[in-house]
Amino acid sequence: DVRDFALWKAPRDNEPCWDTPYGPGRPGWHIECSAMIRKIFGSTIDIHTGGVDLIFPHHENEIAQSEAAYGERFVRHWIHVEHLLVDGAKMSKSAGNFYTLRDLLSKGYSPRSIRYLLMSAHYRKQLNFTLEGIRQADQALERIDNMIVRLKDVRNESGNSTELHDLTAGMKARFVEAVDNDLNISAGL
């Protein structure tokens, strides 16, 4: 049926291909991922991630072929992230509105600030990635670093007080609670 997805594709110029009893070819897009997962992790994995644009057809086809082939559940938990916006528009290599990590690092932005910005929105929400956002992430990290220094100073001055212990234990508990709620790192921060 023409609507079926391809498990094996005919060879194309300048693409790798393999000889098989059915003729030369290459794995279809969906089977590539299933085969790599099977080889490295086995027939069932705990977490599989990807963009929301991959739910259909890619992830549904991965499920169909893997569960049909092995008779076992393919993935226990899916994490589908929303699209990343750059300066208010969907990031697209073809539109030229994207940054590479190398570009950002060469402009002096720290990996830590970039990571913080990317974690500042829940994975199910779109994030508008801007250079101003990285600067704001720098400021947020500076506040966190200053708080840690102050907490260490208080601990050194007063010893391991019950009040300080309760404060930091409460902060940790709220962070863990947020992360336990659909991996909501942004709420934890």
Model-derived regions: residue spans:
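Helix-loop elements that line ligand-binding/catalytic pockets
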Residues: 127, 133-189
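Alpha-helical recognition segments enriched in aromatics with Gly/Pro capping
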Residues: 1-154
